[in-house]
């Protein structure tokens, strides 16, 4: 009888946690958004690439709009992931611009499409400056 109760309890536990585990695996991540960037956005070139003034302006914008979630240096914040990981640093500038523009609301990243396009490129340029030079 004990073994039957143990088997039933185990089966109930498996059934109870399976939906939670499935939801956890399906939760979007910030990095998953990079896999959804359309090709035409991915190949866009940054008009401010290597522009030192754009890096400085992008830093100020980052501090105002991004640092609260991603941390002052991009390493990690209270809510957002590190921006120094290979997934971010090897992504194209066009991909980063697209993610900044469209966000990833399900993963907690706001949409920044209302920021003027030059400012979004400045943030992209600043993010590029955080990686290996």
Indicate where each model-derived feature is located.
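Processing junctions and N-termini across compartments
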Residues: 16, 60-63, 103
């Amino acid at each position: 009888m004990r073994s039957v109760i143990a088997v039933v309890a185990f089966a109930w536990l498996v059934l109870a946690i399976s939906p939670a585990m499935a939801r956890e695996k399906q939760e979007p991540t910030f990095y998953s958004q990079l896999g959804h960037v359309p090709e035409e956005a991915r190949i866009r070139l940054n008009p401010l690439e290597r522009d030192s003034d754009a890096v400085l302006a992008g830093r100020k914008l980052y501090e105002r709009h991004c640092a609260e979630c991603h941390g002052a240096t991009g390493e990690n914040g209270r809510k957002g992931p590190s921006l120094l990981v290979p997934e971010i640093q090897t992504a194209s500038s066009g991909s980063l611009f697209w993610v900044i523009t469209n966000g990833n609301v399900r993963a907690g990243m706001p949409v920044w499409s209302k920021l003027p396009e030059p400012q979004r490129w400045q943030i992209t340029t600043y993010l590029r400056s955080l990686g290996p030079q």
